[in-house]
Amino acid sequence: MQGRIIKGIAGFYYVYDVVEFAVYECKAKGIFRKEKIKPLVGDLVEYEVLDKEEGTGNITKILPRKSELIRPAVANIDQALVVFAVTKPKPHFNLLDRFLVMMERQEMSVVICFNKQDLAGEEETAELKATYESCGYRVIFTSAYKEENIQEIKAVLKGKITAVAGPSGVGKSSLINCLQENINMETGSISRKIERGKHTTRHSELIPVDEDSYIMDTPGFSSLYTNDFEKEELKSYFPEFREYEGTCRFLGCNHVSEPGCMVKNALEEGNIHRTRYDDYLEMYRELEQKEKRRY
């Protein structure tokens, strides 16, 4: 039988069988320990049922992974949905840009969702849309409270495993609840079996939103690591800089203080957004300081 690990805790792996709409509490066979392979949330696995009534089984095989993240340790994530509020609270652009850098480093596609659009004016939404769509990101505005554009989010999730991230207070939990609203009762009972409560999850967990779509809410995506690489790499994680690659006066220009920099020229002409560039500069300086401390 085949299923997907939707949660792992204390050596137990909860395997969701999409055919049966059932979850089995499984242990991994000893062969995995011997081969130093650890099952991960998101893994597609083969398993055998030990007790159908009790819902227990053993994982016998882990199918090949198409991707693997280290922080958090999850497999087969297709994309990330980052959720911020348009207002109340206003977007923390530096936090958003750090998240985007982290995803660019992992070569993962990102969809940006700005929630609470019902509380914002047209000017606010237009500015956010212009800033991030010009960088190549898809931007969707939603209202979990009024259930606006939820179907557009569902279309983005279709057939994928999506990591959902965002700071507290932006309506992320309400959005996830909206996405789960229309799933059938059998799938809905899954969350009860693995004791998913209203509290903040402390373990990576996949939540089925239909038979071939999952979302993952995890605390790991709140801890953003943007200082474990060289400062020269940073520019490649800002997509809007790429069209100017090779056009600056100096080869290897970092777009900071070098003369003849075409990125800074684009900034002055309004073709690159100031908030994005300022966040780039802040991250660059942090990496620079870390490098100095190292030596």
Predicted segments with their positions:
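Beta-strand/loop nucleic-acid-binding surfaces
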Residues: 22-37
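Short, Lys/Arg- and Gly-enriched loop/turn segments at beta-strand edges
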Residues: 52-62, 90-92
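Helix-rich effector regions associated with P-loop NTPase G domains
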Residues: 11, 35-53, 63-79, 102, ...
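Phosphate-binding glycine-rich loops and their immediate beta-loop-alpha structural context
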Residues: 87-136
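Structural detector for short beta-strands of small beta-barrel domains
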Residues: 1-9
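A conserved segment at the C-terminal end of the G1
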Residues: 172-188
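SH3/SH3-like beta-barrel fold
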Residues: 13-18, 26, 47
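Canonical P-loop GTPase G-domain recognition
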Residues: 118-170
